[in-house]
Amino acid sequence: MVAKKIKVFLQWAVALAVGFCIVNLLCMGYERLVGWIETPNGPSPAHWNPGTILVHGTEGYGITKIDQNGYINPDGTLEDSHILCMGSSHTQGKELPSGKNYTALLNTHFAAGEGSLAAYNIACDGNFLPSLIKHFPAAVEAFPNASAITIEISNTDISVEELEYALEQAEYVQDQTAQLGLVSKLKMLIKEYFPLLNLIKSKLETAASAAPAGAEAVSQHAAALLREALELIRSQYDGEIIFIYHQQTGIAQDGTIVFDEDRLFDVFAQACQDNGIRLLDMRPVFVEYYNLHQELPYGFANTRPGNGHLNKLGHRLIAEALIPYLEEAMA
């Protein structure tokens, strides 16, 4: 009797193991993120494991090769005069086929020839306005020949605590992540070769995430710190700085496109103007295109249209809007 139970248990264990291996193998072609290396003193808070292949199929579909620096860029040599592109996962464009994000489109327009890179993408997941400000001087030092810097943001409504964090800017340290510990290497291997585990973990975290707290009145302290932050980054770079501002969209019951409230946007816009920083507000462009063609610049997230990342249309519209302003900087 005991032997029979052991046999049944082993059969189930083998079946589960085989099933896991099959599904894990299928995930290799559906959703395979790669190792994530933190760079607290780098041009961005983190980057991907250099030289790996990232597969992202849970929203759109993209197969992306990570470059030698851990970012999403085509193979090629960076030109002496180039555009440095900072931002979040929207700018990365890992949901798209290769060559369809706006930095690749800028490169196609400005590059001197095949094998040259005129635009370089250092965006990373979760790299929003506070961390963009924090890592700005490190980015300038890491890429001293940048003729222009674009910074993609989707929200300016940030707290005093986030702004205080941002103003404690990172001091650039080159090659700070050359040596990874054993635990970090093990985590990276699990993430890259067991994508099913990573997918399950991601879904559980999404399900457990809490709804955002209700909005409070705009803090005058936060407004003052935001103005200080923009004045600071202006002092750290003499070239063209362009903030690309966009907001994820929704569709109202009457079919019109709507955006969430951003209470600090007016303060941010005035601070950009006061410091000679260009602000490219993509909302009117997106609304005009939607009204003409009924097509959104964002994908789906959790079945809600317009709540996902920038899609091919969104990236193309951003590239088209940027090019006239970058022509002079790249001349």
Language-model regions, residue ranges each:
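N-terminal Lys/Arg-rich, disordered targeting/topogenic segments
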Residues: M1-V8
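Hydrophobic membrane-insertion alpha-helices, especially the h-region
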Residues: Q11-M28
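Membrane/wall-proximal cationic-aromatic binding patches
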Residues: Y30-G113, F286-Y289, H293-P297, A301, ...
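Conserved SGNH/GDSL esterase-like catalytic core that processes O-acyl groups on lipids
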Residues: H82-L84, H90-L182
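Short, amphipathic alpha-helical "lid/cap" segments that border enzyme active or binding sites
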Residues: L129, I133, S219, A223, ...
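Glycine-rich phosphate-binding loop signature in dinucleotide/nucleotide-binding domains
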Residues: A142-A146, Y237, A329-M330
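Serine-dependent acyl-ester chemistry module
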Residues: N155-A269, M282-H293, R304
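Histidine-centered active-site loop/cap adjacent to the catalytic His
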Residues: A301-A331
